[in-house]
């Protein structure tokens, strides 16, 4: 009885997901042709350009976010420089603790699943 209910719920969810994804694709293809892009500005900042493309919006049209290209820092001679910030290199103790926590999480999950299987087998 419960198996049939769960099957029907899963099937209805799959149908609703596939229906929503096809309508989003159809809506995107139908309205993307009506979205117009106009070139607004080309700003020069540290010898690099940042272009902005706004979208004009009407009813049921796809909105677009302005895009700005960010380039890595350079020295005067044109070589790339590693940005310096307080978290450039974590201490070895932090790396070891992160690895141990991930291992404990994986081992704990495996033990929890095996404990649950043992309880189901006994019942």
Swiss-Prot record:
Membrane spanning residue stretches: 93-113
Location within or outside the cell: Cell membrane
Organism: Pan troglodytes
PROSITE patterns associated with the record: GLYCOPHORIN_A (PS00312)
Record's GO cellular component terms: ankyrin-1 complex; plasma membrane
Processing after translation: The N-terminal extracellular domain is heavily glycosylated on serine and threonine residues.
Subunit description: Component of the ankyrin-1 complex in the erythrocyte, composed of ANK1, RHCE, RHAG, SLC4A1, EPB42, GYPA, GYPB and AQP1. Interacts (via the N-terminal) with RHAG; this interaction bridges the (RHAG)2(RHCE) heterotrimer with the SLC4A1 Band 3 I dimer complexed with GYPA.
Protein name: Glycophorin-B
């Amino acid at each position: 009885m419960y198996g049939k209910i769960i099957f029907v719920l899963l099937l209805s969810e799959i149908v609703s997901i596939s229906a929503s994804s096809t309508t989003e694709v159809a809506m995107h293809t139908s309205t993307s042709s009506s979205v117009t892009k106009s070139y607004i500005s080309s700003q020069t900042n540290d010898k690099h350009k940042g272009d902005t493309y706004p979208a004009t919006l009407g009813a049921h049209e796809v909105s677009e976010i302005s895009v700005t290209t960010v380039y890595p820092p350079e020295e005067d001679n044109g070589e790339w420089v590693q940005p310096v910030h307080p978290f450039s290199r974590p201490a070895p103790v932090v790396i070891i603790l992160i690895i141990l926590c991930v291992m404990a999480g994986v081992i704990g999950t495996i033990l929890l699943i095996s404990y649950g299987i043992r309880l189901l087998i006994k019942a």
